[in-house]
């Protein structure tokens, strides 16, 4: 039965269901759930209480359970993202570059020393007696990297600001993926289980958007996180990932620490286009003293 006439919920942690059924009978209960908060929620265990054969004793069977629900963050309102979209899309359009598309065959030509052997067409080479390679048409690639900083902006941490920043990241990712733009994410927010920093490599499509939202949903803001300026400085080191000039970087950060501004301005000057979105409460200042560009203010309601 789908009704809850024999169910009681004592609090938000325990739920009691009473069933009476015969041998070889199965009861399926569907429990509606309203998800009001981003995160990973687990049903850690089940207890079955039943009477003995002669109804003179009470038995309890405990069972472990690994069921979990991952609640995606609420994406920021697309209408509020329009000013951000026009700025990001304009930069991404200017930063687009051409790549060979292996699915669009154009023809065959003679092999040169700059060609890869994987492009050699062996059948055509056997017919002509010379090495021949496949040629492909080019396609346009645009890339945006979302830099999500969740460190506190002052002495206190405000959950509303953190959640709004995550919501903005989800909304921007959804908006860009719908435009065919490759999106990646680098955040100092930590995974609820592994405690590793969230990093999603570039990609596009619905599946990739699900990966991004899953990673954002699994962030636990209560876990101590690395200072974001230190993370970005590691990116600038020669032995690590370099700042890519063909990328547009979108920083979402309520924190405007001077060290962070200095590092961001350094990245901006390395031929990297930067858009800084500052979530802030109404009336708060969100200016950047040490950067050569203007931020985008995002009011937290």
Residue ranges and their predicted role:
Residues 1-195:
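An amphipathic, basic-hydrophobic helix/alpha-beta surface used to engage anionic
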Residues 82, 110-113, 117-301:
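Exposed, interaction-prone extracellular/peripheral surfaces
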